[in-house]
Design a protein with these regions (language model features):
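N-terminal maturation segment of proteins
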Residues: 1-181
């Protein structure tokens, strides 16, 4: 939202508020897809869940999410900066700025924060059944067939995944021998 939603007018700012209000529905959709994938055996590795949790916590840290915080969250600082710029450009007055700030705060607290809280809860729960060691696509349901499809559609080789794996094993052996010589 910060890097991709340009704000040059009041309409742009109200569109930002609309996007913030839609975050919860989109995150809920993403969680549903992740749960369905998990039921099919497609799971995210443990280390990735740690990143999801850590980044989500950081996104909803600071004002307006933490009432006692002395610092603004990155998104809240951005919103306040954009409102100040709209005022400086005489596109809004102080009353309009306060009203837009109030609407943005409500969207962040009532939609955005619960969306990230849901992501944190899902990732914390899913983490308990995530593999500690990342597994390749071949370990996923239909993964070997998918990998073969990728080889055929994304490369110019006629080699199979097994052929490429065998070449890799031979190269590792050759390089080890060369390094130890």
């Amino acid at each position: 939202l910060i890097n991709f939603h340009t704000i040059d007018s009041v309409d742009d700012f109200t569109a930002l508020i609309s996007r913030i209000n839609l975050v919860k529905a989109r995150m809920d959709d993403a969680i549903d897809v992740a749960r369905q994938s998990s039921q099919l055996g497609v799971v995210t590795p443990y280390f990735a869940m740690d990143g999801v949790i850590d980044q989500s916590v950081k996104i909803i840290s600071g004002q307006p999410f933490d009432a006692d915080s002395e610092r603004d969250s990155a998104l809240w600082a951005h919103i306040k900066r954009e409102l100040a710029e709209l005022q400086e450009a005489d596109l809004i007055d102080k009353t309009q700025s306060a009203e837009l700030e109030s609407r943005a705060r409500a969207a962040l607290i009532n939609s955005f924060a619960p969306a990230y809280e849901a992501i944190i809860a899902w990732a914390t729960e899913a983490r308990t059944s995530s593999p500690e060691i990342a597994t390749g696509i071949g370990s996923q349901p239909g993964g070997a067939d998918y990998y073969d499809h990728l080889l055929a559609s994304q490369t110019t080789t006629d080699l199979t995944a097994d052929d490429i794996h065998e070449i890799g094993l031979k190269e590792v052996s050759r390089l080890r021998t060369e390094m130890l010589a």
